[in-house]
């Protein structure tokens, strides 16, 4: 039947070679192949792009301007396509207000639950809060000092969009004269033109009163009118004081603490009704950190102990400090740590009213001659951060600030009213701070009254289902309050995956990009179960994946190859896992069948006998652990998801080393002491951040080979005849570049009802240089032709020039031979950017005392790429360096010299060292989940090596 298959004819996106592919519908399908072979081109740039385009094209032009328009992919036809949803690796959100709870929409159900069955408890005296009668309201007003002026208001519209014309007509009919709109008093006879797209608050002025003893009946009438019109709410707006909120619903009878109407937005930290007024719902506040301002307390003030005031381009602040210290009698030649507390306070927070005379003349002759109070370095940094209009200055000042938990809401983000409402004895903030596994237990064990249970039953079902989905994709260690911007790409993707499982859609084409990233093998089994559950709902799942377990669990595999870039783009094999394993020309098949495998190292390196030791590491879930990192070895940190690997390596070790070696101002996570840093000279963090943020940044510029290539072109006879220097061949400066596109090679065209379109420059046709520059050639190729070469092609082209060939060869060695030298950095994936950084390290002179840190470098890599990567890492270690990586991939784990396994579980159940030693030693530790999965792999590979034919 035609409708049980997706049939693709003539796919040519990027490097795809006009391929035809047939994919079964309603199955779990894995697309695999070498890095750069064309997997994503087939899955995302062909299938997803066309599925999305067809859906968007069915909508109106008005809707399309918001959804964006996708270009038709380069394909002849696709039949049997469903609406497509892409679940990729992009981080969820950089917004500090976005949390796991808001992204998964579980917060919406929590807010609804607390609003409907929550019980307000007074935070002052612990008394249950009950509704207020009119008599209680009148009593409260009469307790105010005599002659206090106030007005009684009835809030009839609160934070609602619209023009509200009917509301104003109703107020007129009721006979009221004044109304307060968005905080301003107006006469009801005025003409109101409210913006219908903005939220408005409208309150009727019921009465204006001066408090005196004989006014009870008037107050009674006013409150009754206010409550009748607003549905039970009234405001006493005290002139010159705080307004008093009244409600027929909830107020403390002892202290008068009022909660107001229990509605979902009261429990939202993104709404003014619920947000903490101090941190505005962020849970954190930026404060200047003394440890960042004075990073080395052994220095004197004269030696530059105050980091923000060290001279960069001006002597203004050093001179001001010098004159202030002379006149305030603070010694500048004493180490900061030995200064008296009073002197330290003066240096940090100012002279507390004492003035000093300051005389300063700048380089341009400008003179400042004043008597002033000494501001103090911390106050100075804080003021400059908040007052400056310069992004540069703000970024510089931000380096000396740290995020501290808000002391008003204690990090819960909500105001006192929201946090006073309890369900099961806990407020919503406390429950959101539980790990998802424990939160699920809380709701499973929740005991409610019979009436509350009837209301809460459907809400609880949704909450439990969504929490279960998150647990089943290996995220039980996360909390709903965790900021979305701190999630890894893999975590963000699995959160979206859990959200999609919860939607229970069927007939959808889901396209996923390596969902196994960041998952331990134990958690991966659960993930595969979740993928199968989505398939069984009647969906087609297309997963771009290299994980062997996922491939073996798939119904169908499509292997793209044989190589990467121009050497890829063909279907090497397609069929069930068993069929692909029998394919002779499929590299994936050879790894699945065991004909090809990554061998165990012949010996484990003993290292150089030195180590870096961290004691008392206690950041996040780390349990005061002491860890030794041996030097001169290939060290891998393992553990189940959420066990504390990233916290230990990235938050503690990396920041400690960066602070000591690079004078980095980023504050390390909690630890007691560190030793052994003198044994290394340089920290190199090879992460997945972009190598550049503009189209002009590319592999050639990043690796430094472009300088050598420009030198070469400047030495040609034609360049010498024309007087062209090296700068002529740069697209960053005027002269040789195309000025129509400023050397970008592309132009951005803004469209009204369509997304911005990028088109090749009509003058240089995307070549980035002007015609005169392109007339200079080396071996028949101009500079633009060279930038269009892949790294592999360029190695052959520049074979006679060792300086260039050596740098290019490192790109090939790390599996980036398919990348073009001029490929914009903005188009490189995180894994490609990471390997680009690795390549640039390989061609540098090795001191043998470098410390390399990599976080999951196997992201996006096929087994063949991983084999190559291990070879590159071995080269760095063989040169005497230390390589430390966080990794789950067992091929990498088995190749390590030394393992540090954290766990045993994720979240609160982790943070301890379960095992350390060689892979063989860890494999024998029964408590180690890593060891349990590693042991059979070691046994399998020993057996393979014993039967493998001699080379």
Where are these predicted regions, by residue range?
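Conserved phosphate-binding elements of NTP-dependent enzyme cores
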Residues: 1-951
């Amino acid at each position: 039947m035609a409708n049980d298959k997706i049939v693709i004819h003539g796919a040519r996106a990027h490097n795809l070679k006009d391929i035809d592919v047939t994919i079964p519908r309603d199955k779990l399908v894995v697309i695999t192949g070498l890095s750069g072979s064309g997997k994503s081109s087939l899955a995302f740039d062909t299938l997803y792009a066309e599925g999305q385009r067809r859906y968007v094209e069915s909508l109106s032009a008005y809707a399309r301007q918001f959804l964006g328009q996708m270009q038709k992919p380069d394909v002849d036809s696709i039949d049997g396509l469903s609406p497509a949803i892409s679940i990729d690796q992009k981080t969820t959100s950089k917004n500090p207000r976005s949390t796991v709870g808001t992204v998964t929409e579980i917060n919406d159900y929590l807010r609804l639950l607390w609003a409907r069955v929550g019980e307000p408890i007074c935070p002052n005296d612990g008394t249950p809060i009950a509704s207020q009668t009119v008599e209680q309201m009148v009593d409260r007003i009469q307790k105010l000092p005599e002659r206090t002026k106030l007005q009684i208001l009835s809030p009839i519209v609160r934070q609602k969009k619209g023009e509200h014309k009917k509301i104003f007509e109703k107020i007129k009919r009721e006979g009221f004269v004044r109304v307060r709109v968005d905080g301003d008093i107006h006469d009801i006879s005025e003409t109101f033109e409210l913006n219908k797209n903005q939220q408005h608050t409208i309150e009727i002025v019921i009465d204006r009163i001066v408090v005196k003893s004989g006014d009870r009946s008037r107050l009674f009438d006013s409150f009754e009118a206010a409550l009748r019109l607003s549905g039970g709410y009234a405001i006493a707006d005290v002139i010159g004081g705080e307004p008093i909120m009244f409600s027929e619903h909830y107020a403390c009878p002892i202290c008068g603490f009022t909660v107001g109407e229990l509605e979902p937005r009261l429990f939202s930290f993104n709404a003014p009704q619920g947000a903490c007024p101090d941190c505005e719902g962020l849970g954190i506040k930026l404060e200047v950190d003394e440890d960042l301002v004075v990073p080395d307390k052994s220095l004197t003030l004269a030696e530059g102990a105050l980091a923000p005031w060290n001279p960069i381009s001006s002597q203004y602040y050093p001179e001001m400090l010098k004159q202030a210290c002379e006149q305030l009698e603070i010694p500048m030649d004493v180490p900061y740590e030995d200064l008296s507390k009073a002197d330290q306070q003066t240096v940090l927070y100012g002279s507390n009213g004492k003035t000093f005379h300051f005389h300063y003349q700048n380089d341009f002759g400008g003179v400042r001659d004043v008597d002033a109070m000494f501001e103090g370095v911390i106050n100075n940094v804080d003021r400059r951060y908040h007052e400056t209009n310069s992004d540069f200055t703000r970024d510089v000042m931000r380096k000396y600030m740290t995020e501290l938990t808000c002391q008003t809401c204690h990090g819960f983000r909500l105001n006192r009213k929201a946090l006073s409402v309890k369900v099961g004895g806990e407020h919503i903030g406390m429950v959101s701070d539980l790990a998802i596994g424990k939160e699920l237990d809380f709701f499973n064990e929740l005991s409610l009254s019979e009436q509350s249970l009837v209301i809460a039953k459907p809400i609880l079902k949704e909450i439990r289902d969504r929490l279960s989905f998150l647990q089943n994709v290996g995220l039980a260690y996360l909390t709903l309050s965790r900021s979305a911007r701190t999630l890894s790409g893999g975590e963000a993707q699995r959160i979206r995956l859990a959200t999609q499982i919860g939607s229970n859609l069927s007939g959808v084409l889901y396209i996923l990009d390596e969902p196994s990233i960041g998952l331990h093998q134990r958690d991966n089994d659960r993930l595969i179960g979740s993928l199968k559950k989505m398939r069984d709902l009647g969906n087609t799942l297309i997963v771009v994946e290299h994980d062997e377990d996922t491939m073996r669990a798939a119904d169908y595999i499509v292997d793209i190859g044989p190589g990467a870039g121009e050497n890829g783009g063909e279907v090497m094999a397609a069929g069930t896992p068993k069929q692909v394993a029998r394919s002779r020309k499929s590299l994936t098949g050879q790894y699945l069948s065991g004909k090809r495998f990554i061998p165990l190292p012949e010996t484990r390196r003993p290292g150089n006998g030195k180590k870096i030791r961290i004691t008392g590491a206690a950041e996040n879930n780390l349990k005061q652990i002491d860890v030794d990192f041996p030097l001169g070895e290939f060290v891998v940190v393992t553990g189940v998801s959420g066990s504390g690997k990233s916290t230990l390596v990235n938050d503690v070790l990396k920041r400690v080393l960066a602070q000591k070696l690079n004078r980095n101002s980023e504050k390390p996570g909690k630890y007691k002491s560190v030793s052994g840093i003198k044994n290394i000279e340089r920290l190199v963090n090879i992460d997945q951040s972009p190598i550049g943020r503009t189209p002009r940044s590319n592999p050639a510029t990043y690796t430094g080979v472009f300088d050598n290539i420009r030198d070469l072109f400047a030495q040609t006879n034609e360049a010498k005849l024309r007087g062209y220097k090296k700068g002529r061949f740069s697209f960053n400066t005027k002269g040789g570049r195309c000025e129509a596109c400023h050397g970008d090679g592309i132009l951005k065209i803004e469209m009204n009802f369509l997304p911005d379109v990028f088109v090749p420059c009509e003058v240089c046709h995307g070549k980035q240089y002007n015609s005169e520059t392109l007339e200079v050639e080396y071996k028949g190729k101009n500079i633009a032709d060279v930038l269009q070469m892949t790294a592999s092609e360029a190695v052959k082209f520049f074979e006679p020039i060792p300086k260039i060939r050596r740098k290019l060869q490192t790109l090939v060695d790390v599996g980036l031979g398919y990348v073009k030298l001029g490929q914009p950095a903005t188009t490189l994936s995180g894994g490609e950017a990471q390997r680009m950084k690795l390549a640039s390290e390989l061609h540098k002179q090795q001191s043998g005392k470098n410390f390399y840190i990599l976080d999951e470098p196997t992201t996006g890599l096929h087994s063949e790429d991983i084999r190559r990567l291990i070879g590159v890492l071995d080269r760095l270690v063989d040169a005497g360096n230390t390589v430390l990586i966080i990794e789950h991939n067992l091929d990498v784990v088995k190749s390590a010299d030394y393992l540090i396994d954290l766990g045993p579980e994720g979240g609160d159940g982790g943070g301890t060292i379960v095992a350390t030693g060689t892979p063989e030693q860890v494999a024998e530790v029964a408590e180690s989940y890593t060891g349990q999965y590693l042991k059979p792999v070691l046994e399998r590979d020993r057996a393979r090596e014993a039967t493998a034919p001699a080379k």
